[in-house]
Amino acid sequence: MKAFVVDRYGRKNGVRAGDMPDPELREDDVLIQIHAAGVNPLDSKIRDGEFKLILPYRLPLILGNDLAGVVVRVGSRVRRFKPGDEVYARPHKDRIGTFAELIAVKEDGVALKPETLTMEEAASIPLVGLTAWQALVEKGQVKKGQKVLIHAGSGGVGTFAIQLAKHLGATVATTASAANAGLMKQLGADIVIDYKKDDFAAVLKDCDLVLDTQGGKTLERSLRVLKAGGKLIGIAGPPDPEFAKQMGASWFLKTAVRFLSHRIRKAARRHDVSYSFLFMRADGDQLGQIAKLIEASAIRPVIDRVFPFESTREALAYVETGRAKGKVVVKIR
């Protein structure tokens, strides 16, 4: 099958187009013919080797982290899906590879595609949808009347998270450029802060939760806008000890993670708030719940551009510019 592959870690080594063996179907797998795949900043980070200590992939590695397609075959223990079903999925972190014509995904990571969406629209959802769901619903437990700040509202995670937070009944603030303020309001943001002109930490206070997609100084400054007992959830790092524990990390890696996150965890305690790192996991049941919200028109996909499969490298480069409004998708068939 045709695929886009990483042979060696590093930006300069890039991603090559090539032929790879068809995936092996395990007894609890669903074999999916991929029609479209989402393109995410995570793809570039994996290519560059940023996660090689935490996610020790065997190279060559097919890149790509979410998809929509049609079930071709199912393993002997699969009960929820059958050939011909239109599905969408985020594969488990150790079995990625959606920039390809076929993929085998464990049944519990798959859900029926929202009926109201095209394949390209559906492929834009899994990674960002699960990230927002696990941050706001699972970890954050956002409730009606709470105040939430979502950084980088015009990005893939941001455009989904704004809509989800609004659906949950929160007052939603976000940071974005003035050019994207209109889109942010359309998606449900109550407060839009122009990050080029205004300091969000001077504008906001008493937030119950901040979802940070930026890391660095933005992460640290976010502590200032939280009320006592508030939650800072970061998806750009640094990883925390709980994450290392979930990953089954070695003693050395656990120690390194504890050191890397010491400063932000200490600062959070000083502000009487909590910090946690989120590395989204595959979850077909949550994708099923997300599909219901989409079919009820509570959430809509936001897609910037769709690239043809042969232009996957260009799609990755476009995502790396940071200028995409919403998601970038590759159309495979």
Where in this protein do the model-derived segments appear?
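Terminal helix/beta-alpha structural elements that buttress the NAD(P)+-binding lobe
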Residues: 1-26, 33-37, 44-68, 73-74, ...
